């Protein structure tokens, strides 16, 4: 999909820790963890966004599974917008203000920390990555993840904080212990709540040397700029916005 070179603004909702915009009545979940854009089994066959209309493949999960997953997660979407559509643009997501912006370039803002954001796996449409904890660990940023996840050994500083259920179209339903800890990114220390992925989901990330899959924690803490064309991540603490 190609996009027109315009500055687009949307209302951004926090739907059960998922970023959702609405375009022409269509509820769209922004998901940097998905290489491709999909329709929900009950969603539209095509999507018009950024001046282009494209037919949408159906997400690789059954209707009953997706409906049960939506009920369990507490939110519903019509379209999962993946990196094939998001990657050509820079995005600025601000849950506190309820706004999302997308454009070929976005102006830099004061009080923003910029980090290199190379694409993981060396592919332009894969989940964006950055370094955390004084550069010692690699993290992927998945806006479609309601919970963050630790890949590998749980840090000794982490505190158990209960249990959680989660759902992923590829992994299905799963349960995890939830931990709480602090994470340092770009000189900022933020609290994170995280679980552990099922082995099938963790094995590839382990092979890539990934230690963290960061979900909604980043959007709660920062006004986030995902400058995909410039391959950089901008973090502006919410108290500075």
Predicted regions mapped to residue ranges:
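Pepsin/retropepsin-fold aspartyl endopeptidases
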Residues: 1-241
């Amino acid at each position: 999909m190609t996009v027109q070179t315009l500055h687009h603004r949307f209302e951004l909702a926090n739907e059960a820790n998922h970023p959702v915009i609405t375009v022409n009545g269509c509820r769209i979940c922004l998901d940097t963890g998905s290489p491709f854009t999909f329709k929900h089994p009950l969603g539209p066959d095509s999507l018009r966004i950024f001046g282009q209309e494209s037919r949408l493949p159906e997400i690789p999960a059954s209707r009953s599974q997706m409906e049960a997953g939506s009920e369990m997660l507490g939110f519903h979407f019509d379209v999962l917008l993946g990196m094939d559509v998001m990657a050509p643009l820079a995005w600025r997501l601000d849950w506190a203000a309820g706004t999302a912006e997308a454009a070929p370039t976005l102006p830099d803002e004061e009080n923003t920390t910029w980090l290199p954001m190379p694409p993981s796996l060396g592919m332009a449409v894969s989940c964006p990555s950055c370094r955390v904890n004084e550069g010692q660990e690699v993290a992927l940023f998945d806006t479609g993840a309601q919970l963050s996840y630790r890949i590998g050994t749980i840090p000794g500083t982490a505190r158990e904080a209960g249990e959680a259920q989660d759902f992923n179209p590829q992994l299905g339903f799963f349960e995890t212990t939830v931990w709480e800890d602090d994470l340092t990114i770009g000189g900022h220390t933020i609290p994170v709540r995280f679980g552990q992925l099922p082995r099938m989901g963790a094995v590839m990330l382990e092979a890539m040397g990934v230690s963290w899959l960061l979900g909604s924690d980043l959007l709660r803490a920062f006004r986030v700029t995902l400058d995909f064309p410039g391959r950089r991540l901008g973090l502006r603490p919410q108290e500075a916005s």
